[in-house]
């Protein structure tokens, strides 16, 4: 059972992980997925999403490594799996794939990222 996808699809305080840089990046991820949902045929929107995902995952993983975060391996695997699936997409992106990305981000933040609150 997952968390509810917000409508409109925007970051809100319920997604706060309490690391300002990560919260700002999460806002950017929401915006990138929202932009893709509005322009699924725009290859630039898909490339931008891939870029911000790569940058965010790198920053988040660096913070976890520096903190010797105990669940780093599982968390990184979730990132790798998402990136692999995202890399398989091409424009135009089907609505079900956009919905999948929205759902994944919501559930990843609230179900996985929340586990590192106060530990990084």
From Swiss-Prot:
Keywords: Iron, Metal-binding, Oxygen transport, Transport
Induction entry: Up-regulated after septic shoc.
SUPFAM superfamilies for the chain: Hemerythrin-like
Tissue: Expressed in the central nervous system. Detected in the pair of large glia within the ganglionic neuropile, in the six packet glia that surround neuronal somata in each central ganglion, and in the bilateral pair of glia that separate axonal fascicles in the interganglionic connective nerves (at protein level).
Domain of life: Eukaryota
One MF annotation (Gene Ontology) recorded for this entry: iron ion binding
Binding site for Fe cation 2: 60, 75, 79, 108, 113
Pfam families xrefs: Hemerythrin (PF01814)
Chain residues that bind Fe cation 1: 26, 56, 60, 113
InterPro entries membership: Haemerythrin, Haemerythrin_Fe_BS, Hemerythrin, Hemerythrin-like, Hemerythrin-like_sf, Hemerythrin_metal-bd
Biological role: May play a role in the innate immune response of the leech nervous system to bacterial invasion. The oxygen-binding site in each chain contains two iron atoms.
Family: Belongs to the hemerythrin family.
Record-given protein name: Neurohemerythrin
